[in-house]
Design a protein with these regions (language model features):
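N-terminal pre-Walker A segment at the start of P-loop NTPase domains
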Residues: 1-28, 167-171, 175-212
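Conserved nucleotide-sensing/catalytic segment adjacent to the nucleotide-binding pocket
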Residues: 2-21, 56-120, 126-127, 241-320
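N-terminal low-complexity, Ser/Thr/acidic repeat segments characteristic of secreted
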Residues: 35, 185-190, 218, 351-358
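An accessory alpha-helical subdomain
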Residues: 127-179, 310, 314-356
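Glycine-rich phosphate-binding P-loop
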Residues: 36-55, 204-241
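Residue-level preference for short coil/turn positions at secondary-structure junctions
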Residues: 32-33, 85, 215-216, 269
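A cross-family "folded-core" feature that marks the main globular domain of proteins
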Residues: 39-40, 50, 58, 66-69, ...
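N-terminal accessory targeting/assembly segments
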Residues: 2-61, 220
Length: 361
């Protein structure tokens, strides 16, 4: 696990999951008042660099931003969000292709295709096509390992669920929300943003601790190795926070994004609810830790011990293999970028970058 600590707010908006690539780019489009700048170009053609320059310029002006990292290469950006301006600039190419719904009104296309010398690139047509195919094959293989690991982790979650006192969990969640979430006036407008705080990457699992510390001063950490208890707790807290009028940031589980929340932020209260487990341990001082074993029949749970240990060992090995394949895919992508970089007019890219900075800032 790589723990990224910075003063900035960092998220992912997409990741490889057991169901394949799962992205939250479209939900961002539908956040109230959001205007999108959609970058179009090839690999290695300056999309991430353009966004890094915009992020740097915004930070120098003291603007609050969210940096959206690429799960296939966390050192690269997939986007920059300006929460207060209700603007975002995104890499709108595969695997998270986006097209404008209302060009010029809701979205502005920032095309860099004109900076590519197609004549130079066509000289290496076969090499480029082969690298695209190899990259796709490696990513597909990695996804299958992640799917296998996800199946085992889901089995562990179901085993824990067999031993859980869910009525006790519900009572606890109700008391917790009553204590921490005062009901807002009826004029309050609840809302939800979807982000990923962690993902499986070529560097292994990455978890943005710095984001937690940037968005919150109070931390409620649910220590749950298998996820059945924390899953229900976060579902109940999410529903109650929205019912009480809060704007929240919901962070789905990168392994089971369709039906499990791992973390939840309430920025107006500087409050975070976090899940701590072997895949993304939470190492932050001053947390209020809740051991989810308190909600389990431990004697019943002991009967699953061998099964749970096997699942964890096997899932770890499968994810290690997925990470290795993702690293190979990144190397393949890096090689692909060399062909494109040799065919790009970066002076023209810089010109577009300056125009975009002036338009957004």
């Amino acid at each position: 696990m790589t723990n990224i600590r910075t003063d900035s707010v960092d998220f992912f908006l997409g990741a490889t999951t057991p169901a394949g690539f799962k992205g939250y780019f479209e939900p961002l489009r539908h956040e109230p008042g959001m205007q999108l700048y959609l970058i179009k170009s090839g690999p290695g053609c300056g999309k991430s660099t353009l966004m890094k320059h915009i992020a740097q310029a915004a930070e120098q002006k003291g603007e609050r931003i969210e940096k959206i990292h690429c799960a296939s290469d966390p050192d690269s950006l997939d986007g920059v969000i300006f929460p207060e301006k209700r603007q975002a600039i995104l890499d709108a190419t595969a695997p998270h292709t986006m097209e404008p719904d209302a060009p010029g009104a809701d979205e502005v296309v920032v095309s860099l295709y004109h900076t590519i010398d197609a004549g130079k690139l066509s000289l290496h047509r076969e090499e480029v096509k082969a690298l695209f195919a190899r990259n796709a094959s490696l990513r597909s293989r990695a996804a299958r390992y992640i799917a296998s690991a996800g199946s085992l982790l889901l089995d562990s979650r179901r085993a824990e669920a067999c031993c859980a006192n869910f009525e006790k969990v519900r009572r606890y969640a109700k008391r917790l929300c009553t204590r921490l979430l005062p009901r807002l006036p009826d004029t309050a407008r609840p809302g939800e943003e979807l982000r990923l705080l962690s993902a499986i990457t070529p560097k292994g699992p990455v978890f943005y601790h710095g984001t937690v510390q940037a968005l919150a001063d109070r931390y409620i950490v649910f220590r749950d190795d298998y996820g059945a208890i924390s899953r229900l707790l976060l579902e109940l807290i999410r529903a109650e926070a929205l019912a009480r009028g809060y704007q929240i940031i919901t962070c789905p589980c990168a392994m089971h994004p369709e039906d499990q929340i791992d973390h939840l932020f309430i920025p107006s209260l500087r409050l975070a609810f976090l899940t701590d487990n072997p895949w993304h341990p939470v190492h932050i001082s001053g947390v209020q830790a809740v051991r989810c074993t308190r909600f389990l029949d431990r004697e019943h749970m002991a009967g699953f011990r061998a099964r749970l240990r096997f699942n964890e060992r096997a899932a770890t090995e499968l994810l290690d293999q997925a990470v290795a394949l993702m690293a190979q895919a990144k190397s393949c992508h890096d090689e692909l970028e060399t062909y494109y970089r040799a065919a790009v007019d970066f002076a023209e890219v810089e010109k577009v970058t300056e125009e975009t900075i002036n338009a957004m800032l």
